């Protein structure tokens, strides 16, 4: 089971030093200009679904996503819930922006300030799979005083816009262009 909380980003992480090398520039050119003959080569350049499920015994290279296959729906649901439970039990801090980590120990800060981690986790899980039914949650998030909430609200809007589920940009979202946090 693979979960992507920002599914509209390309599949591969870009190491900009490595990607600046002549061989990687040639690879970019080959794939992006449509000259490759292997569709798997293009996978790292494309966005991907929020969730993917693979049978590692039958498909060790993880090429055949089973997340949309009805006979795997129950397994997908169990994996989704197991991950959701895990991030809550462990108090996962991986959804915080880099600017949230300066000048203090984040672990101590969220406990001392009684940070609403469960609200953050719910928003994060919703943002990557957002639908128009999520708009009220996203609207509330982008006006939240907590920068992480605003960031993940923006992620939800970006997902909806990319999929053409929304056709206009709310004023509160436009206002975030002037946000003091550069990650938003």
Model-predicted segments: where are they?
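C-terminal, low-complexity/hydrophilic appendages and adjacent surface loops
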Residues: 1-68, 74, 106
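Extracellular/periplasmic ectodomains of large secreted or surface enzymes and adhesion receptors
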Residues: 45, 77-78, 82-90, 95-141
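Acidic active-site catalytic centers that drive phospho-/nucleotidyl reactions
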Residues: 55, 59, 144, 179-181
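Structural helix-adjacent loops and short alpha-helical linkers that scaffold large soluble proteins
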Residues: 71-74, 164-166
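A short structural micro-motif
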Residues: 73, 85-86, 159-160
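Structural detector for internal amphipathic alpha-helices that build alpha-solenoid repeat scaffolds
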Residues: 114-132, 148-164, 175, 183-184
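Amphipathic alpha-helical scaffolding segments comprising HEAT/armadillo-like alpha-solenoid repeats
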Residues: 131-143, 163-177
């Amino acid at each position: 089971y693979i979960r992507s909380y920002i599914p509209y980003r390309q599949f591969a992480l870009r190491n900009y030093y490595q990607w600046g090398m002549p061989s990687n520039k040639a690879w970019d050119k080959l794939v992006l200009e449509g000259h490759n003959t292997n569709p798997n080569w293009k996978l790292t350049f494309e966005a991907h679904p929020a969730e993917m499920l693979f049978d590692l015994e039958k498909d060790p290279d993880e090429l055949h996503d089973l997340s949309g296959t009805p006979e795997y729906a129950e397994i997908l649901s169990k994996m989704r819930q197991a991950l959701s439970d895990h991030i809550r039990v462990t108090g996962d801090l991986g959804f915080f922006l880099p600017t949230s980590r300066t000048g203090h120990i984040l672990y101590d800060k969220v406990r001392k300030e009684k940070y609403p981690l469960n609200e953050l986790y719910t928003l994060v899980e919703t943002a990557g799979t957002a639908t128009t039914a999520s708009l009220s949650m996203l609207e509330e998030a982008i006006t939240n005083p907590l920068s992480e909430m605003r960031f993940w609200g923006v992620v939800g809007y970006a997902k909806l816009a990319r999929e053409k589920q929304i056709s206009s940009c709310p004023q509160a979202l436009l206002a975030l262009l002037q946000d003091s946090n550069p990650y938003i």
